[in-house]
């Protein structure tokens, strides 16, 4: 009778948990821009262009091969990549909750302790959808835990199972291998496997990871994602990164107390727990140390969902007495209540003020009104149907994924953060004392945009020319081109020389010519969010503003996304006359910096052309809302 009652209680817990989760996840389902980078690659694959972000350029712009393959297969069956990006994470996240409650707790009572933080954590709920790989990571973590406990307690599986799951986890989120090493080591050490048995198990288990790595080297030319090379080249000192990493942890504690609170609770419990729980706790600590060492992430809480899941397992396995049970449950409920405002009750309204000086953002809140399932219309599900009819090239960083989906396959996006660009990923990041984690901009070599558009090497820098030629052979020429393997070996084994350091510290001219725009006084666009670059003007070094009529310039103003120094000059009788350097003194709510120009002395000669020059800065500039007046009235 007791066994039947226990079964009924567990069944009721599972059903009630899934019911709550379905409501919460449908309400909060969204798609992140980083996920849209993967979706564009899938879209290109399904349309016959190959698994590439920009057609004709073999670059792995996604970090999660197994997630990419899962979404690609599902998109092929479903027929719509956007529907797939909502549906697959939702189904997988519900499966994870069922798997957790079915196999982890000893009974329904301890199951409640584990499921409370998973339901109330803003981070866990946000990234149970999002289109990112978190749900698949959670699935493989749970399978690894189930397998490890089965081997540890019942010796039901061979170590091959753990190694195979680790291999699949590597293909989903490579750094999570760190977190499961301790429990894998416990399983191996406890059972005294022979060397030959371990070697056989390791060989079989590593087949998926090795097979993918060999394919990646052959197809893309490199063993790791392009994103890894872009982020490894950031040049940020380790102590600065660790400082930012600690801020990332603190940010989570403020925004989402139940996540960090549950992790700390689990680590405390593990001090008196059994061997496997101590192994899980060690995995949490190692992974947290890794997170801190890389500077965390710009998406608040994203990297803490795996440690939270490990913590839920530890809490569930703790089997506390009645008093401790009540104390732990009360603590989790209080912390969960504090986090509740950031879960299903969270507003979808977002201001750029929410991105603190730390550069960490509530990413779902930013995208909720744009990609949230509760907010999107039918047109959103037809994103990839909108295409450029002719080939075009644009330079961008933020909003890379959705810009690519909206632009279609004929739009080549140069990602100056390097995530999707093979050359820029291998150049040093531009030095910026106000760096933001995950957004390390590069300076484009001179004439790089023209080289992409014309499909030939027009660069002027000898060092960049060499790298670009090698990358052209690796990423653009046919796979079996003679000499391609040699270039792959050279690019992977030979380090770049110090002559490229000037891309980090110097101001590099990006174009041989200065672009010009015609100034239209009427209908100046209103400022939108900092991620919206529509109705704006981009330039890399300087830009000319052509006036419809000559006037005596008394004042001028514009908005810029970056707080740089700009030199204002004007043409008079064909001669460029420098006037004044200006710096921003104010920032709008939407994150733009306001620039106002007034000459030190009243000008007495007219001009019909004004030049804005950035003597130094990021190498990529976006200006909006030009206003030129003959009276000193710009606001």
Language-model features, listed with the residues they occupy:
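Membrane-interface alpha helices of multi-pass inner-membrane proteins
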Residues: 20-24, 114-120, 142-143, 159-173, ...
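Hydrophobic/aromatic-rich transmembrane helices and adjacent perimembrane loops
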Residues: 128, 174, 178, 250-255, ...
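Loop-to-helix entry region of an early transmembrane alpha helix in multi-pass inner-membrane enzymes
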Residues: 55-61, 65, 69, 76-98, ...
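Hydrophobic, aromatic-rich transmembrane alpha-helices
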Residues: 2, 97-101, 181-189, 251-288, ...
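Transmembrane-helix motifs of polytopic, lipid-linked glycan transferases
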Residues: 87-108, 143, 147
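Short acidic/glycine- and proline-prone juxtamembrane loop motifs at membrane-interface regions
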Residues: 31-32, 129-136, 301
